[in-house]
A protein has these predicted regions:
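Ankyrin-repeat-protein effector appendages
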Residues: 1-7, 94, 127, 139, ...
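N-terminal segments that cap or nucleate solenoid repeat domains
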Residues: 1-36, 40
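Ankyrin repeat A-helix N-terminal signature
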Residues: 7-12, 40-46, 73-84, 111-117, ...
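Ankyrin repeat structural motif
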Residues: 13-21, 46-54, 80-92, 117-125, ...
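Alpha-helical adaptor scaffolds
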Residues: 65-68, 72-85, 89, 99
C-alpha cells in the first residue's frame, strides 16, 4: 500500500491519497530515493495532500537519503520553477525546522533565495530563519545570491540582515563578491514602475 500512496501523492490525486490513508497506508511511506510521501507532496506544492498526510501522522522533519526535509522540498520545485509559500507556512506550523541544514551547510532560506523565491523567503524569515547563517564556505544567503539579480530576494535579505543588526559596512551586505548588485539594484526595486 505504501507504493500506491507514493504514486497517488506524486500524481497529486488527493482523493486516492485520502482513501489509502483511511485504509491504513503508512503516512511515512518512502519512495526508492528515501523521500517520504510528505516530501513528495511538498515538492508538488499540493497543500491538500500535505494536510492529509500531516493529519495522518507524517513526520514533518523526516530526511531523505541526502538529508532533505519536506520543508526544503517546498522551497523550490526545479521542474515547475517555483516554490510553495503556502506549503512552507503549513509545514512550519506543523513544527518543521526552518534552520535545518544539509550538505555544505545549505538551509531552506538558501534554497529559496537561490531560486528567486521571494515569497518563500519572506515566510521563512517571518518564522525565524537565520539570515546570518553561513554555509560551510562561510557565505550567508545574501552573499550566495547577489550575482543572480533576484532583486526582490536581494532586497528582502538585505532588509532582514539590517533588522538583525548587520550594518551597511558588513562583509555580508557590502564587501562580498557581487555587492555592487545590491547598490545598483536596490533603488530600482523601490520605484513603482518596477
Amino acid at each position: 500500500m505504501s507504493e500506491q500512496l507514493i504514486e497517488a501523492v506524486k500524481a497529486s490525486n488527493s482523493a486516492r491519497v485520502r482513501e489509502l490513508l483511511a485504509g491504513g497506508a503508512d503516512a511515512n511511506a518512502r519512495d526508492a530515493y528515501g523521500a517520504t510521501a510528505l516530501m513528495n507532496a511538498a515538492y508538488m506544492g499540493n497543500l491538500d495532500v500535505v494536510n492529509d498526510l500531516l493529519a495522518a501522522g507524517a513526520e514533518v522533519d523526516a530526511k531523505d537519503e541526502l538529508g532533505w526535509t519536506a520543508l526544503m522540498k517546498a522551497c523550490n520545485n526545479a521542474e515547475m520553477d517555483r516554490g510553495f509559500p503556502d506549503v512552507v507556512e503549513r509545514l512550519i506550523a506543523a513544527g518543521a525546522d526552518v534552520n535545518v541544514s544539509i550538505t555544505y551547510g545549505i538551509r531552506p532560506l538558501m534554497i529559496a533565495a537561490g531560486y528567486g523565491e521571494g515569497a518563500v523567503c519572506e515566510v521563512l524569515l517571518a518564522h525565524g530563519a537565520d539570515v546570518l547563517a553561513k554555509n560551510d564556505g562561510g557565505l550567508t544567503t545574501l552573499m550566495m545570491v547577489k550575482d543572480k539579480f533576484y532583486v526582490d530576494v536581494i532586497n528582502i535579505l538585505h532588509a532582514a540582515e539590517r533588522d538583525a543588526g548587520v550594518g551597511e559596512g558588513s562583509c555580508s551586505s557590502k564587501n562580498a563578491p557581487g555587492s555592487n548588485v545590491v547598490t545598483f539594484l536596490k533603488p530600482l526595486a523601490r520605484t513603482p514602475d518596477h
